[in-house]
């Protein structure tokens, strides 16, 4: 039976969220391909309500000729609703953080991700086709029992990572830099699995061995008050209070200012299904030093230095290398430009269009 409608279902349609933005981009692509397409969400940010409909309205269209494409990244009752419905089903998998990386600090989040991984397995028998945004994620799909899979990166407008920096933040960062010192940057949620404690250890070692004026800027909101407090105490114990900034949630212009002022992007995360800030760093031609774990080496490839472990002295040496070697910085900048071609929106749109048309035709 031919498919004339592909509707996406997502647990939460959030603003300034890579998966939420991808979902809207995919809806627009599906409509351009001639499919009827809407988004149904369990929850939505106030400024995203108009982009879709509550999942309670999912039954307003007939199942015949319709595909439900579920955006899977967390445990949610929405997944159970999709699984029980009679439409053909596709899944777009963005990975789910293993519970053992978060549950000691956030038991409730540990329960959510365990639920999500159980749903990943439960959806496999009823899913015809699954898309992963990295090869790492596709291997997890295969292990969970999905038979027909493909790797396609997130639909992202790379131009959206550019723009004018916030003048207030830019001025503050420039004043600090005028006093000397390297600026290290990490962008991402403050969460145990993101490895901010390892970043702080690396900064301490880098200051001791190479640059006593170096600073670390951690940009992103916290999802664990307990972990955030522990990090702040750790910073105090190491006497780094003046050298570590927890910037919290920032707007787009403020984020641009942090990227523009940074000398190195450092990622020591314990788990990443893709890691969009790596692409942001490439757009800004910011050298990357990263722990080679999960999807990180696949996303970075030759556009950064990837390390086999997070031993502070090794990380510090890598940072010193990219800061002090102009030729290496130019090589990495050129590699970033080349790597970004893989993620160019027109190219990824073509991949999604071809893959979904083929899956619907089966």
Predicted regions and their residues:
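A conserved mid-protein helix/loop that constitutes part of the nucleotide-sugar donor-binding site
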Residues: 21, 182, 191-205, 226-229, ...
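Glycosyltransferase donor-sugar binding loop
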Residues: 41-45, 215-232
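Donor nucleotide-sugar binding/catalytic pocket of nucleotide-sugar-dependent glycosyltransferases
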Residues: 124-174
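Nucleotide-activated donor-binding/catalytic signature segment of Leloir-type glycosyltransferases, i.e.
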Residues: 220, 228-250
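Short alpha-helical donor nucleotide-sugar binding micro-motif in glycosyltransferases
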Residues: 250, 257-262
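Aromatic "clamp/platform" in nucleotide-sugar-dependent glycosyltransferases that forms part
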Residues: 270
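Short hydrophobic beta-strand element within catalytic cores of glycosyltransferases
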Residues: 278, 287-290
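Conserved acidic donor-binding segment of nucleotide-sugar-dependent glycosyltransferases
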Residues: 292, 305-313, 321-326
């Amino acid at each position: 039976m031919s498919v004339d409608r592909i509707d996406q279902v997502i647990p939460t349609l959030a603003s300034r969220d890579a998966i939420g933005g991808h979902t809207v981009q995919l809806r627009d692509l599906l409509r351009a391909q001639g499919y009827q397409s809407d988004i149904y969400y369990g929850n939505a940010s106030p400024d995203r309500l108009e982009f879709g409909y509550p999942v309670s309205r999912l039954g307003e269209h007939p199942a015949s000729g319709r595909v439900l494409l579920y955006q899977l990244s967390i445990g949610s009752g929405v997944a159970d609703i999709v699984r029980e419905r009679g439409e053909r089903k596709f899944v777009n998998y963005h990975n789910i953080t293993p519970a053992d990386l978060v549950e000691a600090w956030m038991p409730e989040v540990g329960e959510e991700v365990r639920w999500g991984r159980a749903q990943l397995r439960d959806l496999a028998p009823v899913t015809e086709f699954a898309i992963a945004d990295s090869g790492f994620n596709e291997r997890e799909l295969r292990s969970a029992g999905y038979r027909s899979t493909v790797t396609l990166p997130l639909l992202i407008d790379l131009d959206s990572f550019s723009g004018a920096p916030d003048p207030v933040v830019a001025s503050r960062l420039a004043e600090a830099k005028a006093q000397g010192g390297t600026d290290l940057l990490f962008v991402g949620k403050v969460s145990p699995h993101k490895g901010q404690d390892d970043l702080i250890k690396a900064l301490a070692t880098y200051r001791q061995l190479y640059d006593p004026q170096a600073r670390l800027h951690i940009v992103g909101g916290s999802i664990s008050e307990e972990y955030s407090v522990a990090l702040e105490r750790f910073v105090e114990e190491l006497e780094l209070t003046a050298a570590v900034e927890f910037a919290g949630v920032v707007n787009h212009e403020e984020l641009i200012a942090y990227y523009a002022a940074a000398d190195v992007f450092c990622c020591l995360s314990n788990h990443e299904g893709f890691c969009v800030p790596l692409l942001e760093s490439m757009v800004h031609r910011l050298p990357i030093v990263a722990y080679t774990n999960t999807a990180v080496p696949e996303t970075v490839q030759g556009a950064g230095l990837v390390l086999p472990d997070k031993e502070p002295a090794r990380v510090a040496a890598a940072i010193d290398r990219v800061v002090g070697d102009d030729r290496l910085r130019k090589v990495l900048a050129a590699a970033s430009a080349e790597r970004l071609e893989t993620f160019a929106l027109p190219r990824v749109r073509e991949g999604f269009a071809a893959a979904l048309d083929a899956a619907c035709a089966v």
